[in-house]
Amino acid sequence: MMENWPKKPEGSQWTDDQWKAVVATGRDILVAAAAGSGKTAVLVERIIKKIINEENPVDVDRLLVVTFTNAAAQEMKNRIGEALEKVLIDEPGSQHVRKQLSLLNKASISTIHSFCLQVIRGYYYMLDVDPRFRIANQTENELLKEEVLDDILEEEYGIEDNTIFFELVDRYTSDRSDDDLQRMILALHTESRAHPNPEKWLDKLVEAYDVEGKTIEDLVYASYLLEDVKFQLETAEQHIRKATELAMLPDGPAPRIETLQADLALLGTLSAAARESWTSVYEAMQNVSWQTLKRIKKSDYNEDIVKQVDSLRNKAKDEVKKLQEELFSRRPESFLRDFQDMHPVLEKLVQLVKVFTERFQAMKRDKGMVDFTDLEHFCLQILSEQSEDGEMKPSAVALQYRNKFAEVLVDEYQDTNFVQESIIKFVTKDSESEGNLFMVGDVKQSIYRFRLAEPGLFLGKYKRFTQEGLGGGMKIDLAKNFRSRHEVLAGTNFIFKQIMGEEVGEIDYDADAELKLGASYPEGEDVAAELLCIQQTEEEVIDGEEGAEVEKAQLEARLMAQRIKAMVDSGYEVYDRKTDSMRPVKYRDFVILLRSMPWAPQIMEELKLQGIPVYADLATGYFEATEVNIMMNVFRVIDNPMQDIPLAAVLRSPIVGLNDEELATLRAHGKKGSFYEVMSSFLKGAPLEEEKELHDKLEWFYNLLQGWREFARQQSLSDLIWKVYGETGYYDFVGGLPAGKQRQANLRVLYDRARQYEATSFRGLFRFLRFIERILERGDDMGTARALGEQEDVVRIMTIHKSKGLEFPVVFVAGLGRRFNTQDLMKRFLLHKDFGFGSQFIDPRKRIKYTTLSQLAIKRKMKMELIAEEMRVLYVALTRAKEKLILIGTVKDATKEMEKWLDAREHSEWLLPDHVRAGASCYLDWIAPSLYRHRDSEMLLELGQGSIPDEIYGYDTSWKVEVVDGNTLLAPEPVQEEKQELLEALREKKAVPLESERKEEVYDRLMWKYGYGEATSHRAKQSVTEIKRNYQSEEGSDNAFIKKLRAPIQTRPRFMEKKGLTYAERGTAVHAVMQHVDLKKPITVEILQEQIAGMVNKELLTFEQAEEIAIEKVISFFDSDLGKRVLAAKSVEREVPFTMMLAAEEAYQDWQGESGESILVQGVIDCMIEEEDGITLIDFKTDTIEGKFPGGFEQAKPILETRYKVQLSLYAKALEKSLQHPVKEKCLYFFDGNHVIKVEE
């Protein structure tokens, strides 16, 4: 097959593996593309090669390309389009390439959800869904679930003799609520939807608990836990072996050897039992007996070695003790009874899940909405049907897609889930050896398990496929990295060769997986990777875990700030590919990567204190903003005024303006009852003189509140919000505060949220407040995000997840000492895709609870998956760096931690012992033991090579490993000597001494004047209208300059509009009609009315503006001589914008600056017509004339001509400059009286 593939062109930039990935065909292909290996370029090139293949070209719409994000899909289309356009330059006559460009926009290059949507839109009639369905908002979805679940549970509570249900409630709810039960039902529903057949998966959960006629050996949980037992016994054996080696040293405790050998024999017996059966291990564990250590005279031996030997033996004994207590303290049949007892309860739970799913789907169907999981399942429903044996097989529709698609290409395949895999399977060929599926990804970068991505799908194929593709699929490794320096790649390899393996990590980091250098860089200074471990001494630690975390963030932030500042100030150089040269590093070249963002605010604050520009998209704090918080309390009070805290907050806010004393006075009027009841009672009585002001404030607010409550029952929520903004004046008030524009923007966002809410299936204020509560419960608060330009010179802070796919010259990975998040393992119930459901055994009657076999197995499995995921997250972080990688972590006691990390230092294999890797609680627990086996850590450890193999100790990588004392970081910076005298003088308020030679310099600076003062009092950009006003202002009048700086009249916000339009708004409406009136149709009342109605529908006019249009005046214009010329003209242009440069003295009568200065002039010409003999310019005016001038139009004419002469002259200049043709005539048309003025120069 290889011989039939096109050969790589001479001088090609593609590597052999990349070229193979571009041209290989004839079977399913899996490309394992390491970080920075150019996978997107390969994918695009493969598509192009298929499209322009001379022998067998494929139309682009016969390819299905699945991407992870919409942005990736658009980028793919853009790249393919650009590549096709390049081909067209070389082959301008190619109709095939032109056809591909026209097909590209409708090609199936999209996310999996977009493809699902395309299938559903085409075959909706095969489903019970409204073809006009919409995608549900996530919060709306959550509220619907809540509503459905509440109804189901209410029904269950009302059923008599519902014994099993009430047992379920007793076991899994508290005295106060059934929230835990609701969480269980929702979690099971969500997990089931990640499987192609949700009901089948749920049924398997129940079947696993049906242990009738089974032994413990038949349980999948026991089989898995036995593997874990072997793992822990092996760990114990390693401890004893290590202790034996130490005891055999010349000054080791030799009398311990006999006991240690007995320990090894005991552990060997247990391990042999574990290889047999659960029952065998149980029996062996009951007979465990450790020999007592013989007394020795410690002074005869090396005391440190004795301690190490005893410590290792105790660790081994603890491993066995832990197994005894967790797994083998109960008889096997006791575990089986747990399953029997829980089976009917779990069966009832699963029944509730199925009922919930059915009703939830029905409610969404009634509301014409679907969610993203529905898209996948509906698509799968269309593409599959059930075979006779109950399995899923391709439907007729799926077979049509198989025939249509010549190839299916999947990007980021490592992030695919089970349902998506089934969809892909049904639209591709059955046989892997003759398949048409091309998959690209890197399982080492699969970091979305929390979104139900399944890296096992990639791993399964990677193990099954071969590099030759014989008898099945083909795998291709793209290991060359074209992003990073050797130091970054070698440093990453050195760590991952030691920590990532199949048993712990799910992936073998072997020779194929290693990163290989593909980029070339000039020689650089200080490019070694670094590990900076900060020692946080006990004296520094603030009381409490939260305080300690804050301090760790501060320590690491200060260290990073010092390093960034030093690198920038010293001119540290990075390579610039655009100029092919080294350049000084800039702030934008740095990124700080964090596992999550809680530390980001402290890091930002510290960097800002050091004068370092920094940006982080915190995406939090919106609902904590004062103005939003106050408004939310207003709406809570409108919904239910009996809530004391929201009402007190509103009364105390600037809206009502009560002070603490007034609030206390009000409360004193009624010590019982709610604030609202007390306020109502207070307002009914006559106030005392000293309470009159309080009474007036409360009466004003009380009346508003009653009006709002009435309004809320009848009108839309968004209208209510604008009503509150307008009637309280709060929107205008916050605009006058510091950061006023931002505050107003926050209030507008709240209004937008309300409109989004009203676009869902929910209505009403109460539900909106619940909607917001759910957003906050899910942690979906919004931040004041801003668009950040790629070239903006700031240090970026982001999560490792956000950084995926990005690259930066200098990367700090911080927070490496923070513990992994294991909260999911602590839940009362656990779910797993393979092992199903596990929870504690709870007997409410006996009031006992304990861990079950299923819970132990699932917890262990989830922990190993979490460890593997965290390894992959660390891999993503380290591979973002192009030139310099700096790792930072903080520990409480570096000496104690180093002792732990050094345990495996002399391990003889590349891969660290399983227990070291599986027992890690933070990234440092992997990084430090790895680096402490490298020669570059010698200066820190002073231990020598010992028995570390040469290939590890001398591995070709450069590292700087340093322990930093936290005290030095927290110490205030020393004050420079030359500043001391100045500081003392300022403290004592004395005159500051000044050297005489600097007096003149200081005087000159204080008396300096800007040389272009004239320019500062005139704008550099003007509109024609502003220039016209400048000419109209009286020569030399005192207020001429003030008029120039007067704020322009702004359009009124809609929420503040009163009935009727202003003169300016009427004029705008008339101009809009004159711009859009159809000159090809007869100008009649009926036709103009029809056209104006159309403008309202298109939102070109409001209804109010349309009502104010005097149609007869528009008709009068077209009946006039000038109007008839417009209708008969060769061409007519309306609302023509222009920009031109104009001499400053022409724009400003009072200009006294230098000649030759220019300003930018902008304007819009109402109408220009081209006739046989030239161009005529027309400006429409809605000025009031009739009745305003005693002498009528004749008196008005010279005044109006003077008023608008400058404006029309500038219009004419602009036209003549742009058209290179003189304007023959300039006309003003006044609608009031149907008058025309021809303006002469």
UniProtKB/Swiss-Prot annotation:
GO molecular function, one term: ATP hydrolysis activity
SUPFAM superfamilies noted in UniProt: P-loop containing nucleoside triphosphate hydrolases, Restriction endonuclease-like
Keyword Hydrolase: yes
EC number(s) per entry: 3.1.-.-, 5.6.2.4
CDD domains, per the entry: SF1_C_UvrD (cd18807)
Residue span, UvrD-like helicase C-terminal domain: 505-805
Residue stretches making up the UvrD-like helicase ATP-binding domain: 12-485
Cited Pfam families: PDDEXK_1, UvrD-helicase, UvrD_C
InterPro entries membership: AddA (IPR014152), DNA_helicase_UvrD-like_C (IPR014017), DNA_helicase_UvrD/REP (IPR000212), P-loop_NTPase (IPR027417), PDDEXK-like_dom_sf (IPR011604), PDDEXK_AddAB-type (IPR038726), Restrct_endonuc-II-like (IPR011335), UvrD-like_ATP-bd (IPR014016)
UniProt cofactor(s): Mg(2+)
Residue sites binding ATP per the record: A33, A34, A35, G36, S37, G38, K39, T40
GO CC aspect terms: cytosol; DNA helicase complex
GO BP term, pick one: double-strand break repair via homologous recombination
Segments crossing the lipid bilayer: none
Record family assignment: Belongs to the helicase family. AddA subfamily.
Classification via PANTHER family: ATP-DEPENDENT HELICASE_NUCLEASE SUBUNIT A, UVRD / RECB / PCRA DNA HELICASE FAMILY MEMBER
Protein name in UniProt: ATP-dependent helicase/nuclease subunit A
